[in-house]
Amino acid sequence: MILDEIIKKTKADLEKRKKEYPLEWLGRSLAYNPFVPRPVEEVLKSTPDDPYKIIAEVKKASPSKGVIREDFDPVAIAKEYEKGGANAISVLTEPHYFQGHIEYLTQIRRYVPMPLLRKDFIIDKYQLVEALVYGADFVLLIAKALSRKELKELLEYTWHLGMEALVEIHDKADLIKAIFAGANIIGINHRNLETFEMDMSLSEKLIPLIPNGKIIVAESGIHSHEQVVELNKLGVDAFLIGEHFMRQDNIAEVVKKIKGLA
């Protein structure tokens, strides 16, 4: 199972980083941290004047597709997203399978004003402090990778640090975890992280089970304005899109098309 492999690798990396930069060191650096987390919920909530909120992803590679974009400049890509009207930016920081780096958060934060999501396999509070230090405004918490207790504890610590979390689900069991934890933002990933199979009907199946008042994000397999319109009718507020944008020559124009602005 690829998810198990990634989590195993993440744990090994964490042990090294904790020795190199102990939590006490990270905690001290928070006192000098210039990055104050920016509001996320109001940015992602669908509104009449901006119904299709976009979380545009900075992603060089993936385990299923390999390298997606050869000419990879995270800051230049982020600027294209800003030009296209994206509402937030997702930054892959997992190094082995996605060729991401946590420094990308800081680099992008210096140049674009939108909230930044640290997209990684977060299993430890240490990673949440890291996210804050490097400039993230919200983090991804994958329900499938965490127990109910772990998810709740990590979510509450995220809030304690002043950040927000996108809690990702793929089935009813994940949704129960997310509701138990008190998630405000719930992401439905159409892709199964264990098999990489895609099920675009998942949003339609799971949205009716989500309590009112939650911000709903659709993830994976989205590549057209028509899809965005239909999913929005079902109750989706925001759309996390990565690979489709990463394969474009004119990223800003494609973001506008997805939003229906071009």
Curated annotation (Swiss-Prot):
Alphabetized Gene3D superfamilies for the sequence: Aldolase class I (3.20.20.70)
Protein name: Indole-3-glycerol phosphate synthase
Disulfide linkage: none
Molecular-function GO terms, alphabetical: indole-3-glycerol-phosphate synthase activity; phosphoribosylanthranilate isomerase activity
Family per similarity comment: Belongs to the TrpC family.
UniProt KW Amino-acid biosynthesis keyword: yes
Taxonomic lineage of the native organism: Bacteria, Pseudomonadati, Campylobacterota, Epsilonproteobacteria, Nautiliales
EC number of this enzyme: 4.1.1.48
A matching Pfam family: IGPS
Annotated catalysed reactions: 1-(2-carboxyphenylamino)-1-deoxy-D-ribulose 5-phosphate + H(+) = (1S,2R)-1-C-(indol-3-yl)glycerol 3-phosphate + CO2 + H2O
Gene: trpC
